[in-house]
Amino acid sequence: MAAQDPRTKFKTTDYEKQEQEVPGLQSEMTPAPDCGETSYQGNQRLQGYKMLVTGGDSAIGRAAAIAYAKEGADVAINYLPSEEQDAQEVSQVIEESGQKAVLIPGDIRDEQFNYDLVEQAYQQLGGLDNVTLVAGHQQYHDDIHGFTTEAFTETFETNVYPLFWTVQKALEYLKPGASITTTSSVQGYNPSPILHDYAASKAAIISLTKSFSEELGPKGIRVNCVAPGPFWSPLQISGGQPQSKIPTFGQKTPLGRAGQPVELCGTYVLLASEESSYTTGQVFGVSGGVQID
């Protein structure tokens, strides 16, 4: 039997408690998330494609960007300037895969930057075939009184508004056959009481995915969503979870462990590729068995 037991394929023992300031750096995590730097093997399923990935410096966005490159695509990634160290690592992997890497730092909470981001990606890549929206903000609070208006606003200004602005601009360049991939979460279906704003923002992304798909399907553009479960990432150790939950993070899933970002590569590649030519408006759960409905 060639397949590995999914319960033990990756780390199953407790993680070390570790805390970073927002947004967190993958390069300073112990252990570093596996984003497919050496573990993902491509098969030229996206040869010639031009891709834009937000949040492409670490964890899920990094895994998508690396997988796209290993499948033959040129990739532009967006990230915060403070994440330059992680972004440079991604750029190196993309270039070692024989593909073009375009780095576009900036804060997606700035509306104009989102328009400029798409324009720069299109110009520097020489086209645009897929936009993958991963960048997100997550901060836990112990109870409802901890969720200030400012906290809610920051979450939606990071998780929801940029998605809308980026898609608006990208439609100037996306042709029939192109695709958009959004990133929600199991929190969009099973909200945690310590993540009211984050969960609500992820539910909004599911709704936008479906409404976008209704509008853009007749134009030949597919829109789908990935809903990850608990994945080991800088998001968790920079205030996304209480420190008390870090050691056993992900262990309550049916598979008994947190996911590694590389385990999302296949889903992002599938949704961007011709293999999903009849798939739009769908949400794909990659959750270790946590149910979405």
Where are these regions (language model features)?
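Conserved mid-core segment of classical short-chain dehydrogenase/reductases
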Residues: D14, D110, Y115, Q123, ...
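Short C-terminal tail/terminal secondary-structure segment
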Residues: M29, E37-T38, Y268-V269, T280-D293
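The beta1-alpha1 cofactor-binding region of Rossmann-like NAD(H)/NADP(H)-dependent oxidoreductases
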Residues: E84, P105-V118, T149, V262
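Catalytic Tyr-X3-Lys loop
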Residues: D129, H145-F164, T181, I205, ...
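Active-site helix of classical SDR
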Residues: V167, S201, T209
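Alpha-helical segment proximal to the catalytic Tyr-Lys
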Residues: E172-Y173, E214-P218, S277
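A glycine/serine/threonine-rich, flexible loop-to-helix segment
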Residues: P218, P230-T253
